[in-house]
C-alpha cells in the first residue's frame, strides 16, 4: 500500500520534523510513505470570506496536482467522521482488501481546504471537534496510521 500525505506549508520546528521522521521510519515496514508539502498562501489579518476562499482555491490547485485519479482520498476536516483507532485501522485494512493500492491523506492550511479538494474527497475524517495546528496534525496523523498498521498486524502497541 502506498500512503501519501499532502500538506499545506512547511514544517519549521525541529521537534516536529524529528517526530515526522521517526514515524516515517516506523511506517516504512508497513507501507510506502510519501509526504508532499505544497506552498501556503499568506492570509492577511481580518481577511474577508472572499479573500479566504481565494486562498483556499490557490492552495487547493497546488494540492490537486498531486492527486492521482485512482487514489482513495481522505481529507482531514473538522466536520468529518470521528473514528476510533480501531475503526481507522479497519478502514485502511478494508481498502487494501478491496484493491485500493494508494491512499492520500490531505491536511489543509490554517483556513482549511478549498471546494475542489473537498469535492475530490472520498472520505472526510475528523480527529476532534477542536482545531489543531496543521503542522502538529501531521504528527498525529502519522502516529494514527502507524497505530493502524500495528492493529492490522495484531502487534502490540501502547494503549
Task: Please name every model-derived segment.
Residues 86-128:
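A mid-sequence interfacial segment
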Residues 39-101:
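S-adenosyl-L-methionine/SAH cofactor-binding core of RNA-modifying enzymes
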Residues 11, 78-81, 109-111:
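Short glycine-rich anion-binding loops that position phosphate/pyrophosphate groups of nucleotides
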Residues 31, 70-71, 121:
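Short, well-ordered alpha-helix to beta-strand connector turns
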Residues 115-159:
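Structured adenosyl-cofactor binding patch, chiefly the S-adenosyl-L-methionine
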Residues 6, 34-36:
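General small-molecule cofactor/ligand-binding pocket signal
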Residues 15-17, 84-86, 115-117, 136:
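Short glycine-/acidic-enriched loop or helix-start segments at secondary-structure transitions
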Residues 1-27:
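N-terminal beta1-alpha1 ligand-phosphate binding loop
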Amino acid at each position: 500500500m502506498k500512503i501519501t500525505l499532502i500538506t499545506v506549508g512547511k514544517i519549521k520546528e525541529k521537534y516536529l520534523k524529528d517526530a515526522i521522521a521517526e514515524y516515517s521510519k516506523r511506517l516504512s515496514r508497513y507501507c510506502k510513505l510519501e509526504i508532499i508539502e505544497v506552498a501556503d498562501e499568506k492570509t492577511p489579518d481580518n481577511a474577508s470570506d472572499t479573500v479566504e476562499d481565494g486562498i483556499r482555491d490557490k492552495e487547493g490547485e497546488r494540492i490537486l496536482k498531486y492527486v492521482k485519479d485512482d487514489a482513495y482520498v481522505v481529507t482531514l476536516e473538522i466536520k468529518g467522521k470521528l473514528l476510533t483507532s480501531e475503526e481507522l485501522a479497519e478502514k485502511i485494512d478494508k481498502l487494501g482488501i478491496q484493491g485500493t493500492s494508494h491512499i492520500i491523506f490531505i491536511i489543509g492550511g490554517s483556513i482549511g481546504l478549498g471546494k475542489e479538494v473537498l469535492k475530490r474527497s472520498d472520505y472526510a475524517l475528523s480527529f476532534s471537534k477542536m482545531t489543531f495546528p496543521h503542522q502538529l496534525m501531521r504528527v498525529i496523523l502519522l502516529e494514527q496510521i502507524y497505530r493502524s498498521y500495528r492493529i492490522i498486524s495484531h502487534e502490540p502497541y501502547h494503549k
